[in-house]
């Protein structure tokens, strides 16, 4: 009986751990952003207080079934280019109040809400955002915006 319980507990723990593994594309993209210089020195990972332990342990992200579903990085002094292209389960993003200069959310079919206000965004890509309902881009450096890929 003890062996059976121990075995079941091990299987459950292992399945929970696997459930938090991030897809390679998403992990690579987030890791690249974490290594970029932050607005006030250091890098973006340091600005978020990321202490390592796997990219799925990044503060401010929610992971479900191996995919990022939500990012909440508002007012964190982040900077650089954030490429969230091809994040199929991403639904909500709040990166407001940073110094991000470029953003791509192309190929994020589940994206419902994007708040990227109060940044330095000069370019943003939206292709394939069929579910987008809330878009906040005020106080950026956009000269024009192509919303052809947005309903």
Q: What are these model-derived regions, one by one?
A:
Residues 76, 98, 116-119, 137-140:
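Consensus "Asn ladder" position of solenoid repeat domains
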Residues 71, 81-82, 103, 124, ...:
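Canonical leucine-rich repeat
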Residues 12, 17, 104-106, 119, ...:
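Serine/proline-rich low-complexity intrinsically disordered segments, especially terminal tails, linkers
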Residues 65, 85-90, 106-111, 127-132, ...:
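Leucine-rich repeat
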């Amino acid at each position: 009986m003890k062996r059976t319980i121990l075995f079941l507990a091990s299987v459950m723990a292992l399945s929970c751990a696997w459930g938090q593994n991030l897809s390679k594309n998403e992990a690579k993209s987030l890791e690249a952003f974490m290594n970029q210089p932050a607005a006030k020195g250091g890098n973006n990972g340091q600005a978020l207080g990321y202490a390592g332990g796997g990219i799925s342990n990044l503060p401010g992200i929610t992971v479900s079934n191996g995919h990022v579903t939500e990012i909440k990085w508002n007012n964190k002094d982040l900077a650089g280019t954030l490429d969230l292209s091809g994040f199929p389960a991403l639904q909500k993003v709040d990166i407001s109040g940073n110094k991000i200069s470029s953003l791509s959310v192309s190929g994020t079919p589940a994206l419902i809400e994007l708040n990227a206000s109060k940044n330095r965004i000069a370019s943003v890509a939206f292709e394939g955002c069929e579910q987008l309902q809330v878009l906040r881009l005020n106080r950026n450096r956009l000269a024009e915006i192509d919303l052809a890929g947005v309903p």
